[in-house]
């Protein structure tokens, strides 16, 4: 099992950013002002409240503690650079970041720990998608997870190496 001490500061920041990146990808895939606040809350709840994954409990637990500490200290979390970029470019950059995290986990972690961490990231993406309702009018005809969000989650899963 790996711990925070096994990672450089840059690597650790990549790991901290990964669940946020996955959540933002889902939110951007089918962005609606009315659902964005719920999805942001869902992303935070997904990071902090979902069960710790088997095999990666220590690593994810340490990461959650860092996220909580930054939040309590009102430290600004890194945001993807979106200035002057079209949404497709931003999404491609985010997938690249998640691919880098997947490679880092595969390189440094035992397989069960890497898989557990990746599944936790997917759990954050799923919780984000399920937190808002998409489409419809005043909630009528809306769906919990849109097709665009499902497509984004599929790309995330493939990039993390969880599905082909």
What are these regions (language model features)?
Residues 1-164:
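Small-residue-enriched hydrophobic alpha-helices in membranes
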